[in-house]
Regions:
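Gram-negative outer-membrane beta-barrel transporters
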Residues: 464, 582, 586-593, 609-702
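A beta-strand signature from Gram-negative outer-membrane beta-barrel systems
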Residues: 132-177
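Membrane-embedded beta-barrel scaffold of Gram-negative outer-membrane proteins
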Residues: 340-346, 507, 513-515, 519, ...
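Transmembrane beta-barrel wall of Gram-negative outer-membrane proteins
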Residues: 192-266, 271-275, 327-337
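Short acidic/polar hinge/loop motifs at secondary-structure boundaries
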Residues: 117-145, 271-274, 279
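Face-selective signature of the C-terminal outer-membrane beta-barrel domain
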Residues: 321-484, 505-509, 576, 581-589, ...
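Extracytoplasmic beta-strand/coil segments of soluble accessory domains associated
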Residues: 75-117, 139
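Short, acidic, small-residue-rich periplasmic hinge/interaction motif at the N-terminus
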Residues: 24-67, 106, 586
Length: 716
């Protein structure tokens, strides 16, 4: 997609208006006070630093973000970092997008904004679409790989990502931004329409009353999407205020935006990808004999030919509307030169629904009948289901940092409480009973999630360039379901984990350093692994040990079938930093017990179905480097070579016979990834040529070459 951006800048000086470039400047409170700069929001215990912290990480700076961001979602911007891959539901990187890090999907990552957890407490997923245009207000992004030292949010299995927003400026300014994008479909039926539009207005107050700063940004992004009926309409806002006192800094952030998007969560068969028209297809459901189809000569026959069992096109009514405002209060108090107290309070409230095709559902599934108060003589036809979710989450993240001379000690805690309401109703159907109540909820339940953790983190400085890190986290969390309509399922499942981490960093010279870290991390399964209550109307049941004697099912809610994951992660790395070049190397060894792996199936919403594997292992090498080729020209890149294998994993076929998969590659994990970026930069212009390679990877665990995603290469 080609993008053109036009920016109008206005800097306000003494009530006049001059055209100029907005720039950051040092903030000078009253003359008798100390000189302040505008500090970013950094969670010190989780933010890694070169030559100090023994952690494998990469940073995207404010300049990187400004140069590369236009309209794309956060995962697309991050996709060039080491071991990172991105997928897009609607095909153009605007809408629902997902990140994989070292092959681990984003449910296994710990995602934070200003240190505040963003993973959904029940599903563990991250809905980047709920943060439209947030990158325009972001100052820094750090990605830690492996068992990242993120003490807030879910334990980091594959890694952690922290976005830091710091949009304030001491210089008053107004900026109006417009972006136009031309979509290349490769389909003669569509041509090259103007498919993406963005408009945004940014206001910085500068210094007000010698100690206050205010910031506001309003925007809107619209896109037709690449796939059929996959458009998005994303409004956004980010409002912030800061007060700086002699020993305190207080910030308030309020951000989010209502969204409206067409559903595109169901994928296409691999063999459709070679046809420029069919690969834009957006099906609600599809069944086909993909193994019998030639990828080229017969691809166009899928819509009409014998290779399709059935295909249900996505209906225009299948859309989502959602809004999740985020409110944060971030306070820093420097009690003494050696002691600083940090407190973060936050509140999220998300409400919305999506409407999807349920033409396959009968009266029994939709709970229509005499026993439900609606006598039905025939099944509904062409049903559309509206699924609603309402979330409320409040949290407090306190921590104290102590400089005790030989090191820095951080003590902190996390308290989060999440409550949710879920229900479904029939948005439309033919042949409904005459007295049918359109507000009738055929499923409904409330979710509960409580999270409490304590941690201690020490970076101890030894003699001559040696730093030792030791961390310990005690994490308690509890899942629960209450007030389930019709089935009456109620349970509460607690988890308690102790997550230690140790490491050492040594600075051999001014240019060369090395590190070693060892971490043990445990993580609970997500709610759907225990009970997909929103799917109970078409057959989902609680996944707990059950007693079926006497013909009645009695669940033991103290014995969930899905087990927590346990990871031992060892990272050995080195960094070289020169005047014109830099290089980082990392060897990693990740040994799992009970890893939740994909089994090759997807649910009705296109999401992978997972289950525990007894023992798995991931190991490999990562390299990241940059070199200045000539004045203005730089070449940067990274590569990952890894091996991801099932060590002990047995499944059972339909007849109940065991199938041993020991030694097979793990679904969803490519063994080879690479990125290159050639950049030219001067005072007025920045341009880049980008190449990305993603190696082939299996889509299930059988090691059958027919079930693989082919390797791909992309130039931008």
């Amino acid at each position: 997609m080609s993008v053109t951006r036009v920016i109008l800048l206005g800097a306000l000086f003494g009530g006049g208006l001059a055209v100029g470039a907005a720039q950051d400047a040092e903030l000078k409170p009253p003359p008798e006070d100390t000189l302040y700069t505008l500090p970013p929001v950094v969670v010190t215990a989780t933010q890694a630093r070169e030559r100090s912290t023994p952690v494998t990480f990469s940073n995207l700076t404010a300049r990187n973000i400004r140069e590369r961001y236009s309209v794309q979602d956060i995962p697309v911007l991050l996709s060039e970092l080491p071991s990172m891959t991105t997928t897009s539901e609607n095909g153009n990187g605007i809408g629902y997008n997902y990140i994989n890090l070292r092959g681990f999907d984003q449910r296994r990552l710990s995602i934070m904004i200003n240190g505040v957890p963003q993973n959904d407490p029940e599903d563990h997923n991250v809905y980047w679409i709920d943060f439209p245009d947030l990158l325009a207000s972001t100052d820094n992004i750090q990605v830690q790989r492996g068992a990242g030292s993120a003490f807030y949010g879910p334990p980091a299995i594959g890694g952690s990502i922290n976005l830091v927003t710091n949009p304030f400026s001491a210089t008053p300014s107004i900026m109006v931004e417009s972006v136009l994008g031309i979509q290349e479909y490769g389909d003669s039926l569509k041509g090259r329409p103007l498919a993406t539009r963005k408009v945004a207005v940014t206001v910085n107050s500068g210094i007000v009353g010698q100690r206050y700063l205010m910031y506001g940004r309003l925007g809107r992004i619209t896109s037709d999407g690449y796939r059929v009926n996959s458009s998005v309409d994303l409004s956004s806002y980010f409002l912030g205020a800061m007060r700086i006192d002699r020993s305190m800094i207080t910030r308030v952030h309020f951000f989010g935006g209502p969204i409206h998007d067409g559903l595109a969560y169901y994928g296409i068969p691999k063999w459709m990808g070679s046809d420029p028209h069919l690969r834009r297809s957006n099906w609600s459901d599809l069944s086909a004999d993909s193994l019998a189809v030639s990828y080229t000569s017969r691809a166009r026959r899928i819509a009409l030919g014998s290779d399709t069992t059935y295909a249900v096109p996505r209906r225009e009514e299948e859309v989502e509307t959602f809004s999740q405002p985020h409110a944060e209060l971030i306070h820093e108090w420097r009690i003494s030169p050696r002691v600083t107290l940090h407190n973060t309070l936050f509140y999220y409230a998300g409400d919305g629904s999506f409407t999807y095709d349920a033409s396959w559902a009968d009266s029994a599934m939709l709970r229509i009948g005499t026993s439900y108060g609606f006598p039905a003589e025939e099944n509904p036809r062409n049903a559309l289901v509206q699924a609603f979710v309402g979330n409320r989450q409040v949290g407090w993240l306190p921590r104290v940092e102590i400089d005790h001379g030989d090191g820095d000690l951080t003590l902190g805690a996390e308290l989060r409480f999440h409550r949710s309401t879920h229900w479904g109703k029939i948005a439309y159907a033919e042949n409904l009973p005459e007295d049918f109540d359109p507000g009738y909820h055929f499923y409904e339940y409330n979710g509960v999630r409580d999270i409490v953790s304590l941690y201690a983190h020490e970076i101890h400085r030894l003699a001559d360039g040696w730093n030792v890190m030791a961390s310990l986290q005690l994490a308690y969390n509890r899942y629960g379901i209450r007030d389930e309509k019709y089935l009456g399922t109620t349970f509460s499942v607690p988890y308690l984990f102790l997550n230690p981490r140790v490491g050492v960093n040594v600075n051999a010279t001014e240019s060369l350093s090395a590190y070693l870290s060892v971490a043990y991390t445990s993580r609970e399964p997500r709610m759907r692994n225990l009970y997909a209550a929103e799917d109970s109307w078409f057959g989902a049941t609680p996944q707990f040990a059950a007693d079926t004697s006497g013909g009645t099912v009695r669940y033991d809610f103290g014995s969930p079938l899905a087990r927590p994951e346990h990871l031992l992660d060892v990272e050995l790395g080195g960094r070289f930093t020169g005047r014109d070049a830099g290089l980082t190397l990392c060897l990693f060894w990740m040994d799992f017990r009970d890893e939740l792996v994909r089994n090759g199936q997807v649910d009705i919403f296109g999401q992978p179905v997972t289950g525990n594997a007894g023992r798995t292992r991931h190991y490999g090498i990562e390299a990241e480097g940059i070199v200045t080729l000539a004045e203005g020209f730089t070449l940067g890149g990274n590569a990952t070579v890894s091996r991801n294998r099932l060590v002990r994993y047995t499944v059972y076929d339909d007849g109940g016979s065991p199938v041993v998969l020991d030694g097979n590659p793990i679904a969803g994990f490519p063994d080879l990834l690479a990125n290159l970026r050639l950049t030219y930069r001067n005072a007025w212009l920045t341009g880049s040529l980008v190449w990305k390679y993603v190696g082939a990877f299996p889509t299930d665990n059988t090691d059958d070459p027919r079930f693989r995603n082919d390797a791909c290469r992309v130039w931008n």
